[in-house]
Amino acid sequence: MEAIKPLPQVSSFSASVFSFLDGRFKESTDLSHSTGLVSELQTEISELDQRLAGLNRQLESGLAAYASFSDRVGGLFFEVNAKLADLSSSTSVTRSASDSGKEEEATEHVAGEDLPSLAKEVAQVESVRAYAETALKLDTLVGDIEDAVMSSLNKNLRTSRSSGFEEVRLHAIKTLKTTEEILSSVAKRHPRWARLVSAVDHRVDRALAMMRPQAIADYRALLSSLRWPPQLSTLTSASLDSKSENVQNPLFNMEGSLKSQYCGSFHALCSLQGLQLQRKSRQLGIHKGENVLFHQPLWAIEELVNPLTVASQRHFTKWSEKPEFIFALVYKITRDYVDSMDELLQPLVDEAKLAGYSCREEWVSAMVSSLSLYLVKEIFPIYVGQLDEANETDLRSEAKVSWLHLIDLMISFDKRVQSLVSQSGILSLQEDGNLLRISSLSVFCDRPDWLDLWAEIELDERLVKFKEEIDNDRNWTAKVQDELISSSNVYRPPIISSIFLQHLSSIIERSKSVPALYLRARFLRLAASPTIHKFLDCLLLRCQDADGLTALTENNDLIKVSNSINAGHYIESVLEEWSEDVFFLEMGTGQHDPQEVPGLENFTEPSEGIFGEEFEKLEKFRLEWINKLSVVILRGFDARIREYIKNRKQWQEKKDKEWTVSRALVGALDYLQGKTSIIEENLNKADFTAMWRTLASEIDKLFFNSILMANVKFTNDGVERLKVDMEVLYGVFRTWCVRPEGFFPKLSEGLTLLKMEEKQVKDGLSRGDKWLRENRIRYLSEAEAKKVAKSRVFS
């Protein structure tokens, strides 16, 4: 029987043994647990022995690999030394005086040929040496990482020596960073070593796959010990809008070792995430500053938000018909704890060198994401179902109101949480990527069909309200009087155009809340563009009604058309002004949905702008009806001047002493002046100018073709009569210009020819087109000038 070993001397115990025994045997009753302690220690010793054996095998393998590399490198060095010796002997042979020059040249030629190949072999040896050293160094580092990971997973180490466990994990993270630095250097300097990098990446990925879940599990355990999340049961609907003065924040209440453990765990998670981002940047070949393409939420912040989300959803289920309470609760939680993100956690993120991350921003983003996920899963399906199931008009109207109320809540919520982020001064809210992360409206990115539904509802509601304003005739007659809007005085639009712009501006303002550029443009094309088309249809219908009833012969119909043109031109000018705004210019860059959402054509060409098509249609409408007004007046003027034109004998009659203007022309000119004055009083100045200039051009053609080109004979008195009549005609247009005859070019130049002497005309026309230009006759062709000259009768 084996003798019982005596107990060791107490004086031989180390300080750590004393500390261990004191911790295990505080009282005499603890001696009963000694058997269990022995079993536990034996188990741990067995595990350590197994681990030691594994490390020995790994060491043997490493030494064997090193020996293999050493043998190979030694062999290469031996070959190089041998060739260097041969080279030395070939170049140091003593030449005798009798040696010929040919032998010397041959020896130097041989040595010169050997040098390049020798240099190449030396470079290969150096490359192999560098590869071997790098491979061994990486193998050692990865081995340290794997050891540290296995140690961190050891249950006994985790329970009995928490400080040692933290040190092991910290050492593993530092080693991972060192390994990543070497891999980055190798990837840049030695791209041919890709297989080495791939092999190391594979082993590191396995280590990280074990480290991250364990780090997250430890972090969750610490949060649980901190009693996170805080209690939400005390919340009531009355307290949702007010900020809690005595809010219980477990993060601020941490003390001592618990705070140290939490900060260490938070720092470890941030370091692991930063390391993963570096590895991903290297593997994708992305340079520093371009990692926004794969921005990841901060893991540690996500773990803070997840239990809060679970606790909040217990309240959400009670408020399914009161979504305003849901938004209020999420905002309250976000606001109450956002300060601790800056004060407590941001320094830890900075210490972990996790560039480009703001804890405040990540906290708000995570809370908004949790809300968006709940909206997608629980709220929106209910609202969509209500719209699909509502067959009756009243029920569908209620469903639309509920939908728009939900959108209003989302827009209001986004503005409030974005103000929380902007207070830090870090985030640029003008960037679509940032807006997507802190906007509840980002739900439409994955569900563009819901965006289309929203645009349809928005359009219907606006058109219903606008129709009531369209049917009010007073809105079409009263003018916009706003001294602050200079364009309103220029275009003299009716009130209906201002009302329309209010509805259109409201749609545009709501579109600004949509976080993605391509979705913003999609919404405007589905909601704003049809609104403009509807208004244009109303303008066109009013003009067509006036034209169809009286062919625009009544003054009221001319006023009606003039007001419609004013309204259209005013809207056209506003759209042109908007097209220069940055908000609309961005939509004209041709950017589209990266997922190429079907069902919507490319919304715009870069040169057109978002409302390019609508602008062109408004311009076409305006020009068409301006021309229509001039045609109507010309038609009436032509009907009243028929007798004057048919009287061909009047141009050969002798001059009367009291002769002023032809009586047959007076009535036509009175009609012309009366109708034009009516239009001047009601049409905006720019379009009226275009109208009377078009009218003058048509009257010029009418008189020229009907009188001067109609083979009429003119005596001296006839020429004088025509001159006087035309002066009266010019006088009608002198109200709007200084030199009206310039707008009757053919008539004026025809009179110039008629007033010339017979010899001057005959001699001049024989010189042809050159003579016409010298006499400033530019609008008449040579044939027309000759025909006018032939109509002159000289006495």
Curated annotation (Swiss-Prot):
<dbReference type="GO" id="GO:0005829">
    <property type="term" value="C:cytosol"/>
</dbReference>
<feature type="region of interest" description="Disordered">
    <location>
        <begin position="91"/>
        <end position="111"/>
    </location>
</feature>
<dbReference type="GO" id="GO:0006888">
    <property type="term" value="P:endoplasmic reticulum to Golgi vesicle-mediated transport"/>
</dbReference>
<dbReference type="InterPro" id="IPR042044">
    <property type="entry name" value="EXOC6PINT-1/Sec15/Tip20_C_dom2"/>
</dbReference>
<dbReference type="GO" id="GO:0042406">
    <property type="term" value="C:extrinsic component of endoplasmic reticulum membrane"/>
</dbReference>
<keyword id="KW-0472">Membrane</keyword>
<keyword id="KW-0175">Coiled coil</keyword>
<dbReference type="GO" id="GO:0006890">
    <property type="term" value="P:retrograde vesicle-mediated transport, Golgi to endoplasmic reticulum"/>
</dbReference>
<feature type="domain" description="RINT1/TIP20">
    <location>
        <begin position="207"/>
        <end position="795"/>
    </location>
</feature>
<dbReference type="GO" id="GO:0070939">
    <property type="term" value="C:Dsl1/NZR complex"/>
</dbReference>
<protein>
    <recommendedName>
        <fullName>RINT1-like protein MAG2</fullName>
    </recommendedName>
</protein>
<keyword id="KW-0653">Protein transport</keyword>
<dbReference type="Pfam" id="PF04437">
    <property type="entry name" value="RINT1_TIP1"/>
</dbReference>
<feature type="coiled-coil region">
    <location>
        <begin position="35"/>
        <end position="64"/>
    </location>
</feature>
<keyword id="KW-0931">ER-Golgi transport</keyword>
<dbReference type="InterPro" id="IPR007528">
    <property type="entry name" value="RINT1_Tip20"/>
</dbReference>
<comment type="subunit">
    <text>Interacts with SEC20 and SYP81. Interacts with ZW10 (via the central region). Forms a complex with ZW10/MIP1, MIP2 and MIP3 on the endoplasmic reticulum.</text>
</comment>
<feature type="compositionally biased region" description="Basic and acidic residues">
    <location>
        <begin position="100"/>
        <end position="111"/>
    </location>
</feature>
<keyword id="KW-0813">Transport</keyword>
<keyword id="KW-0256">Endoplasmic reticulum</keyword>
<comment type="function">
    <text>Functions in the anterograde transport of storage protein precursors from the endoplasmic reticulum (ER) to the Golgi complex and in the retrograde transport from the Golgi complex to the ER. Forms a complex with ZW10/MIP1, MIP2 and MIP3 on the ER that may be responsible for efficient transport of seed storage proteins. Required for the responses to environmental stresses during seed germination and vegetative growth. Probably not involved in the retrograde transport from the ER to the apoplast.</text>
</comment>
<comment type="similarity">
    <text>Belongs to the RINT1 family.</text>
</comment>
<dbReference type="GO" id="GO:0006623">
    <property type="term" value="P:protein targeting to vacuole"/>
</dbReference>
